Design a protein with these regions (language model features):
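Fold-core signature of tandem repeat domains
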Residues: 62, 84, 97-107, 161-162, ...
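Amphipathic alpha-helical segments of tetratricopeptide repeats
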Residues: 24-28, 63-68, 105-112, 144-152, ...
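Short coil/turn linking the two alpha-helices of tandem helical-hairpin repeats
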Residues: 4-9, 31, 46-49, 53, ...
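Conserved alpha-helical positions within TPR/SEL1-like repeat arrays
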Residues: 5-8, 37-50, 75-90, 117-132, ...
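TPR-repeat structural position
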Residues: 13-17, 52, 94, 136, ...
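Residues that mark the junctions of alpha-helical repeat units in TPR/alpha-solenoid scaffolds
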Residues: 31, 36-38, 70, 77, ...
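Amphipathic alpha-helices of TPR/Sel1-like and other helical repeat/solenoid scaffolds
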Residues: 9-31, 55-66, 146
């Protein structure tokens, strides 16, 4: 979601609604914009929608805009599946949540996008979902795989690596494995301390 830090919550929604109205008007003309633009617009609308059923419908409509998945739109389609999976998860539909979360991650894998920032919340959310579904080992395995990819493409002292370590710590804590939880939390906070040495309030 696009962030507008200068808007408070009310004005943020008001501002986003204004932007969406402008874009909706523009994209009504078929020769303006692409299928991806239309999908993104529906995704924005789903983000602002307060009624779960309507938000789910908007995300499904967004996915329906894109007939063929290519290297150019794979990241967007993966995000749409992740968002739809998240909505299903929050609204008590675990089977549909799993289906879309797994599709989201398989697209990242298929198009060699597992190392990008988008993969971190998607895989972290999937791992937490698996833990809720009494499958913490699978969740841990997904996060360990992601840790290896981040280390290979970036490093093991970057913010992305720390976020994954913190999620691992959270899952171990949820499953009452305190020694492992402590190990991963320590790794995460060591990185946070280094990155935010000049901004301790961020830790």
């Amino acid at each position: 979601v696009v962030k507008f830090p200068y808007m408070d919550n009310y004005n943020y929604h008001k501002g986003m609604n204004g932007i969406i109205q402008e874009l909706t008007g523009l994209l009504k003309t078929k020769n303006i914009g692409t299928d991806s633009d239309r999908a993104l617009l529906l995704d924005f609308q789903a983000t602002l929608e307060t009624k779960p059923e309507k938000a789910i419908k908007l995300e499904k409509d967004a996915l329906a805009q894109i007939e063929t998945i290519t290297a150019d739109n794979a990241r967007l389609v993966s995000n749409l599946h992740a968002n739809l999976g998240g909505l299903y998860r929050m609204n008590g539909h675990p089977d549909l949540a799993r289906e879309h979360m797994e599709k989201s991650i398989s697209l990242l894998d298929q198009f060699n996008l597992l190392h990008i920032n988008d993969s971190i919340p998607q895989i972290a959310n999937y791992a937490m979902f698996l833990t809720e579904q009494q499958e913490p080992e699978r969740g841990i395995s997904e996060l360990q795989k992601l840790s290896g990819i981040i280390k290979e493409y970036h490093s093991d002292d970057c913010l992305d690596y720390a976020k994954v370590q913190e999620t691992l710590g959270t899952i171990y804590l949820m499953t009452a494995n305190l020694p492992q939880a402590k190990t991963h939390f320590k790794r995460a906070f060591k990185i946070y301390e280094k990155i935010w040495a000049d901004e301790p309030e961020m830790i």
